[in-house]
Amino acid sequence: MRSHRLRLPCAIILAAMALTVPGWGSLPAPARAADAPLTLALTPSRDPAALQEAGDAFVRTITRLSGVPMRAQVASDYAGVVEALRSRRVDLAFVHPVGYVLANREAGCRILVRDVWGGKTAYTARFYVRKDRGLQRLEDLRGKTVAFVDPASSSGYIYPMVLLMKQGLVRERDPKTFFKDALFAGTHEAALQAVLHGRVDAAASFDKAPELHLKDPALIAQIGFVGETPEIPEAGICVRPGVPDETVAKLKRALLSIKAPRHAALLKQIYDIDGFVEADDRDYQPVRDAMQLMNLNPPK
C-alpha cells in the first residue's frame, strides 16, 4: 500500500487526547484573505522534498480542474495533521483510516474521497509466517513470537489484535496472553524481515505487504499467512469544517476525475494510488469499533 497508510505512530493518539488540555493545541486559527489558496496537508511518508514536489504537481492539477486555488504542505508528523485541521491551518488532508476517525472526532472533519489502490477501496491485515515452519492456523501461533508494527497501526496491530480477541485467543488486550512474546518492529518491512530471518514466528501486516516490501519473488514465495481480518477501509482525503459547500463540491468533482490512465503518473507520484471514489463517514465505523475494542478512543 502507498505509504501514507503504512504506519500511524501512537503519537497521533496521544496528541488527539491532548487537544482538549489547556495549553495544548489552543492557538487561534490564523486570519486569512478570502481569496487565499486552500492548503492540502500531505502526511509524511518519504523524503519531504520529493513529497512536496509531488504534492505541488497534484494541487496544480486540482486547481486546473476545479478552479479552486490550492497549495500543498508536507506535515512535520502525523499528529500535526489532526492539529492543523483542528486549528484551521490546513483545509484538507490525506489521512489514514485511524487518522480520519481522529480528525472527524477532534476537528469535525468529513471524508471527501477514498483512495483506490490496486483496483480496491479496502484492504485486509494478515498474520504472516514462513511456509517451512508448519504453521497452518491462528491457533498454531499460541506460545510463539510475533512482530507487530506500531500500537496505532490499523493493519499492523489494531485489526490483527481485534481478530485475536474476537476468536478468544487474546485476553484483556494483552498479546502476551496468547503469544510467548510480542514486539513492535516499527515498519511493515521490518516486521516481515523479522519473520524471514527467524527472529519471530509471525508478523502482522497488510495484504499486499510482501509484494510491496519484499519485492524479490524468491522471498515472497517463502511467506504465507495463517489468519486474515475483515476489510479495512482505504485512506482518503478529508476536509475541515468551514470550507464552503460549493468549494467542497468543486474539489470533490475534480478529485473524482483524477484517475488512470490519464493521470497515472501523477497518482503514482503522490501516493502510488489509482484514483479516488465516493466516500462516506459510515465507511469508517468499523475502524471506530476496532479502536473502541482496543481502548484507543481518546476521552471526551
Language-model-detected regions and their locations in the chain:
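Bilobed "Venus flytrap"/periplasmic-binding protein-like clamshell domains
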Residues: 35, 40-63, 98, 123-191
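Short helices/loops that flank or line small-molecule/ion binding pockets
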Residues: 79-93, 106-107, 139, 183-204
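N-terminal hydrophobic or amphipathic helices and topogenic motifs
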Residues: 2-7, 11-80, 88, 265-300
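Periplasmic-binding protein-like
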Residues: 36-45, 51, 116-129, 214-258, ...
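A ligand-binding cleft/hinge motif common to bilobed small-molecule-binding domains
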Residues: 94-106, 160-166, 194-221
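Acidic, polar ligand-binding/catalytic clefts
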Residues: 83-140, 151
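Short helix-initiation/N-cap motifs at beta->coil->alpha
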Residues: 72-83, 172-193, 231-233
